[in-house]
Structures are given as C-alpha cells and as structure tokens.
From Swiss-Prot:
Post-translational modification: 4'-phosphopantetheine is transferred from CoA to a specific serine of apo-ACP by AcpS. This modification is essential for activity because fatty acids are bound in thioester linkage to the sulfhydryl of the prosthetic group.
GO function terms (MF aspect): acyl binding; acyl carrier activity
Keyword line: Cytoplasm, Fatty acid biosynthesis, Fatty acid metabolism, Lipid biosynthesis, Lipid metabolism, Phosphopantetheine, Phosphoprotein
GO BP field: lipid A biosynthetic process
Function of the molecule: Carrier of the growing fatty acid chain in fatty acid biosynthesis.
InterPro entries: ACP (IPR003231), ACP-like_sf (IPR036736), PP-bd_ACP (IPR009081), Ppantetheine_attach_site (IPR006162)
Protein's name according to its UniProt entry: Acyl carrier protein
PANTHER family: ACYL CARRIER PROTEIN, CARRIER DOMAIN-CONTAINING PROTEIN
Residue list for modification O-(pantetheine 4'-phosphoryl)serine: S37
Organism the protein comes from: Sodalis glossinidius (strain morsitans)
Family: Belongs to the acyl carrier protein (ACP) family.
C-alpha cells in the first residue's frame, strides 16, 4: 500500500470516526461509512490541508468513495 493511500485512509477514518478496517477502497462515504454532507465537506478540507492541494467543488462532488479520494490525491501529487 502506498503512503498516499495509507494517509488518505487514516484521514478518512479520523474524520468520519470509523475504524481503519472499515475504510476499504470501494467504501462509499455516505452509504458504507455513514457520512453526511457536512462530513464530506470537512473530509475534503482535511485532504486539501494534509496534501497541500486544492480540490475544486466540481471535483469534490465526484469524490464519493475511498478509492476516488486516493485517485484524486495521487493525481494531484504528480
């Protein structure tokens, strides 16, 4: 597992108050991890801060799963 993937999963677990074991790549923030719209906004902000990147609103709306978050952050770090 890459460091970005590990970091993204750790942030998701912390922000959503779930166990790290629950944060699997295909997990949906809302359906599987119990996030609401405020949780997802706070999650995006935490990812932006941790990885020193900006996630435009139209992209943030597409980030609905753990894998989507990992993919976006990996692309932004290249």
């Amino acid at each position: 597992m890459s460091t970005i993937e590990e970091s993204v999963k750790a942030i998701i677990a912390e922000q959503l108050g779930v166990k790290k074991e629950e944060v699997v790549n295909n997990a949906s923030f809302v359906d599987d991890l119990g996030a609401d719209s405020l949780d997802t906004v706070e999650l995006v902000m935490a990812l932006e801060e941790e990885f020193d990147t900006e996630i435009p609103d139209e992209e943030a709306e597409k980030i609905t799963t753990v894998q989507a978050a990992i993919d976006f952050i990996q692309a932004s770090q290249q």
